[in-house]
Amino acid sequence: MTYRLEFLPSARKEWEKLGHTLREQFKKKLAERLEMPRIPADALHGMPDCYKIKLKSSGYRLVYEVIDERVVISVVAVGKRERSSVYERAKKR
């Protein structure tokens, strides 16, 4: 089953601020996650149904939520990992 991709409005703004290369790297990984979104190693503690995609070379993270009822992956936050700021923003949304 393939999931659809959605963005929270605030995550969409963060996405649009990313450079072309970073967006392309995330797109490739998101395409894989649309087929199989639940990767246990990437589950976020304290945030049910939320997972991360990390670009190790650049230090960027993308946090998404899996919504099975609507067959949707919703991007919650995108940003640098610096002091876990991307994860803190994701928790607040």
Residue map of PLM features:
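A short, surface-exposed loop/turn module that caps and links secondary-structure elements
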Residues: 31-56
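Compact soluble domain cores
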Residues: 21-35
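Generic secretory/membrane-interface signal
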Residues: 7-8, 36
